[in-house]
Amino acid sequence: MNFLAHLHLATLADSSLLGNLLADFVRGNPQGEYSPEIVAGIMMHRRVDVMTDTLPLVKEARGYFSADYRRVAPITLDVLWDHFLSRNWDKLMPDCSLPDFIEHAQCQILPHLPLTPARFQNLNAYLWPERWLERYAELPFIADVLQGMANRRPKLAALAGSFHDIEQHYQPLEQLFWAFYPAMMSQAQDKQI
């Protein structure tokens, strides 16, 4: 899962949005560095990542990537799941529009930015004003996201090429999303993540 899905599942679970978004920027045990609520959000994010990566359907999705891109497929899929979520938001959350959800999330996170790592503050300087969470619905933006990640981290250069496999296998990958994500939503609502 990427930013949007983590925020979405956190909302369903009544978990800290800040903690869930911040988690990738916190190494080791966050106890003592952040409030218990934020720590719980960080830990939920980590559980979601482990859960997602070990799902048989997600392992099946990795099989749609050619050998050159299979190593980065988990990262590519995290971004792609956000694409499907953003594109189908109204079906999954008919009572709250995506722009309203994003505004709510932003209001929960931005007041706490001064207490967060500089890299996280830098992310937030782009995430909200450039409307990334809404733009995830656009497939060309997904290509741009993967290219940007590849440019920033040379070891992940294969991310840029992995977009070709998304285009080649878009429909079966979307079917896999629908096969697992609604169940994760239910687990979040039931506080089972």
Swiss-Prot record:
One of its GO terms (biological process) is fatty acid biosynthetic process. The keyword Hydrolase applies. It comes from the Bacteria. The keyword Lipid biosynthesis applies. Transmembrane segments: none annotated. It is an enzyme of class 3 (hydrolase). InterPro entries: ACP_PD, ACP_phosphodiesterase_gpbac. Its EC number is 3.1.4.14. One of its GO terms (molecular function) is [acyl-carrier-protein] phosphodiesterase activity. Keywords: Fatty acid biosynthesis, Fatty acid metabolism, Hydrolase, Lipid biosynthesis, Lipid metabolism. It catalyses: holo-[ACP] + H2O = apo-[ACP] + (R)-4'-phosphopantetheine + H(+). Belongs to the AcpH family. HAMAP family: AcpH. Converts holo-ACP to apo-ACP by hydrolytic cleavage of the phosphopantetheine prosthetic group from ACP. This is Acyl carrier protein phosphodiesterase. It comes from Yersinia enterocolitica serotype O:8 / biotype 1B (strain NCTC 13174 / 8081).
